[in-house]
From Swiss-Prot:
Reported function: Thrombin-like snake venom serine protease.
Subunit record text: Monomer.
Expressed in which tissues: Expressed by the venom gland.
Biological process annotations from GO: proteolysis
Domain of life: Eukaryota
Protein's UniProt keywords contain Secreted: yes
EC number: 3.4.21.-
Keyword Protease: yes
Full protein name: Thrombin-like enzyme collinein-2
The entry's keywords: Disulfide bond, Hydrolase, Protease, Secreted, Serine protease, Toxin
UniProt-annotated location(s): Secreted
EC class: hydrolase
A cellular component term, taken from the record's GO annotations: extracellular region
């Protein structure tokens, strides 16, 4: 999945994935 947040550090990506799994789409925010 190519997200505009790809520029964020790997840590942010992992946090994003964790949040996405929780059901909250914080990545798109």
């Amino acid at each position: 999945t190519a997200l505009p947040q790809l520029r964020l550090p790997a840590t942010s990506r992992i946090l994003c994935a964790g949040v996405l799994e929780g059901g909250i789409d914080t990545c798109n925010r």
